[in-house]
């Protein structure tokens, strides 16, 4: 795991590609006109609270959205990118491997309409997916 995931620095939040074998867990955003990318497929994660480290932010967001306790050992890749909402700041993107059993244990929270598994290659090419997240997953696939 990259050391910066346990350090405090200025970042806006964390998004996570949660892989279950060759598929990625996706969430359909709420269809509300007052949020960015309404009714669009995205990945778990969100904004930093207080002085969280990237790992703390990731673990809190995944717990809130999916009811999963994400162990740091599940992180297989990470990279810092420009924030999707503020290009002058940084955001963290991580790729994690979770088991079928963990996937079955998901308790979907109150953010988003639904979740499902999508083949990674389909996610990269699909319409209706946040483009920056497609690029980040593509980076992982090309560099692994």
Locate predicted features.
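A generic structural signal for short hydrophobic patches within well-formed alpha-helices
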Residues: 48, 123-124
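Conserved Nudix-box catalytic region and its N-terminal flanking loop in Nudix hydrolases
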Residues: 23-64
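Short, charged, solvent-exposed linker or helix-capping segments at domain edges/interfaces
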Residues: 103-109, 126-130
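A short coil-to-beta-strand element that immediately follows conserved catalytic motifs
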Residues: 69-79
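Short secondary-structure boundary/capping segments
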Residues: 8, 16-17, 32-33, 83-84, ...
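Short connector loops at helix/strand junctions that flank enzyme active sites
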Residues: 11, 19, 38-43, 87-91
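Acidic, metal-coordinating catalytic segment for phosphate/diphosphate chemistry
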Residues: 1-15
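Active-site-adjacent beta-strand/loop module that shapes the phosphate/pyrophosphate-binding cleft
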Residues: 20-22, 79-104, 116, 120-122, ...
């Amino acid at each position: 795991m990259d050391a910066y995931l346990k350090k405090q620095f200025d970042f806006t939040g964390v998004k996570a590609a949660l892989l279950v074998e060759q598929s990625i867990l996706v969430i359909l955003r709420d269809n509300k006109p007052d949020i960015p990318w309404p009714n669009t497929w995205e990945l778990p994660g969100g904004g930093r609270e207080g002085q969280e480290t990237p790992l703390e932010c990731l673990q809190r967001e995944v717990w809130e959205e999916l009811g999963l306790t994400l162990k740091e050992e599940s992180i297989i890749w990470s990279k810092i990118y420009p924030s999707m909402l503020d290009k002058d700041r940084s955001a963290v993107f991580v790729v994690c491997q979770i088991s079928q059993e963990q996937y079955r244990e998901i308790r979907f929270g109150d953010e988003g309409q639904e979740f499902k598994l999508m083949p990674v290659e389909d996610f990269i090419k699909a319409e209706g997916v946040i483009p920056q997240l497609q690029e980040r997953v593509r980076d992982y696939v090309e560099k692994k």
